[in-house]
Amino acid sequence: MRFFATLVLALPALAMATAVPRDVNGGTPPKSCSSGPVYCCNKTEDHLDKGTTALLGLLNIKIGDLKDLVGLNCSPLSVIGVGGNSCSAQTVCCTNTYQHGLVNVGCTPINIGL
C-alpha cells in the first residue's frame, strides 16, 4: 500500500519534468522575438476555432485582422523551469498578451528542437 501511495505522489513530479529546448543548430533558444519575449504556451489554437473565439469574446479581446495562432496559458520562457529555460509545450512569439499570459494573440511557433 505504501508503494502505491508513493507512486501516486511521484507521478505528478515526473510528469512535470521538462527538456531544455535547443534550436536546430544545438544552441539555446532565443530569449526574445522581434515583438517581445519567447513564450511557452500550454496550448495554441487557430484564431478561427469556435472555442477560442468564444473565450476571446468572453474576455472582450478583439484580434482584428490577425491570422496567426492564439496562445493559451502562456509564460515568458525566461521564467519557466528551475536553473534554466525549459518548455514542454509550444514555444511561440506573440504580438499581444492579455490577462497576464492567459491569452496571447498573433502567435507564431518557433522551431526549437527538444
UniProtKB/Swiss-Prot annotation:
Keyword Signal attached: yes
UniProt source species: Schizophyllum commune (strain H4-8 / FGSC 9210)
Similarity comment: family membership: Belongs to the fungal hydrophobin family.
Record-given protein name: Class I hydrophobin SC16
Disulfide topology: 33-93, 40-87, 41-74, 94-107
Cellular location(s): Secreted; Secreted, Cell wall
GO cellular component, one term: extracellular region
Function: Aerial growth, conidiation, and dispersal of filamentous fungi in the environment rely upon a capability of their secreting small amphipathic proteins called hydrophobins (HPBs) with low sequence identity. Class I can self-assemble into an outermost layer of rodlet bundles on aerial cell surfaces, conferring cellular hydrophobicity that supports fungal growth, development and dispersal; whereas Class II form highly ordered films at water-air interfaces through intermolecular interactions but contribute nothing to the rodlet structure.
GO molecular function, one term: structural constituent of cell wall
Annotated glycosylation sites: 42
Pfam families listed in its UniProt record: Hydrophobin
Record key words, sorted: Cell wall, Disulfide bond, Glycoprotein, Secreted, Signal
Keyword Kinase attributed: no
Domain writeup: The N-terminal tail up to Lys-31 is not required for self-assembly into rodlets and is amenable to modification so that functionalized hydrophobin assemblies can be created.
Major location category of this protein: secreted
Signal peptide segment: 1-17
Subunit structure: Self-assembles to form functional amyloid fibrils called rodlets. Self-assembly into fibrillar rodlets occurs spontaneously at hydrophobic:hydrophilic interfaces and the rodlets further associate laterally to form amphipathic monolayers.
